[in-house]
């Protein structure tokens, strides 16, 4: 039947895990009106990460100026202006949560002259001022390839600079039409070559790519100097999003991990539920 969604296999039936920290974080985020990608992107690891006392903060609101067909975050051409108090609120939440490692990400803000880069730097500075011992990973957008905006963020020297290629180049037109595969690779190369940053990227599988295409993209990432990799199963957020072509079995994720480690990636997280920030900081 056209439009029929695939039935999830047994290995994708996640057992909910919650601890006392889960409720504490939920209350804190509600009280401070902060956004997390955990909730906005419907991450399957939300319960696990929150129960471990970690979260990924979503900067610049929860509405994106782009409409990637895989993403659950809402889209709008002219979102509300950035909240100038958000950097301080996030820094306060990091302190209250006693985080040892912080992950920051953001929506695309193509409506802003700098894509939100200054807001990024203000948030990073605020966190480092209030929690100087906390590690910091930044999962950045492409800033439309604006070198000045990219350098503004990279000059703050996060411990890890993460930028996802998301999928193989053949699928970009249908999955990520407002982005460029080669531009994403150049961002990772810039972070390492010009700034000496540890770089990381992530891919989703199950969208129609072949095993060989994923391996080829891994090679592209290594050529760009990327040393850390995440690979996870694409899960269709709603019926209107890009359909799942297939559910990749666990043993295929193991094969991806072996291929990546053989290429020289220092850290590889590969599995059905893996997402960009899954176990972030565990390799630090």
UniProtKB/Swiss-Prot annotation:
Pathway in which this enzyme or protein is active: Protein modification; protein lipoylation via endogenous pathway; protein N(6)-(lipoyl)lysine from octanoyl-[acyl-carrier-protein]: step 2/2
Domain Radical SAM core as annotated: residue spans: 50-266
InterPro entries linked: Aldolase_TIM, Elp3/MiaA/NifB-like_rSAM, Lipoyl_synth, rSAM
Reaction(s) catalysed (UniProt annotation): [[Fe-S] cluster scaffold protein carrying a second [4Fe-4S](2+) cluster] + N(6)-octanoyl-L-lysyl-[protein] + 2 oxidized [2Fe-2S]-[ferredoxin] + 2 S-adenosyl-L-methionine + 4 H(+) = [[Fe-S] cluster scaffold protein] + N(6)-[(R)-dihydrolipoyl]-L-lysyl-[protein] + 4 Fe(3+) + 2 hydrogen sulfide + 2 5'-deoxyadenosine + 2 L-methionine + 2 reduced [2Fe-2S]-[ferredoxin]
Enzyme class: transferase
PROSITE patterns (UniProt xref): RADICAL_SAM
Chain positions recorded as [4Fe-4S] cluster 2 binding sites: 64, 68, 71
Binding sites annotated in the UniProt record for [4Fe-4S] cluster 1: 38, 43, 49, 277
Keyword Transferase: yes
GO molecular function: 4 iron, 4 sulfur cluster binding; lipoate synthase activity; metal ion binding
Cofactor binding, per record: Binds 2 [4Fe-4S] clusters per subunit. One cluster is coordinated with 3 cysteines and an exchangeable S-adenosyl-L-methionine.
UniProt similarity note: Belongs to the radical SAM superfamily. Lipoyl synthase family.
Protein name, per record: Lipoyl synthase
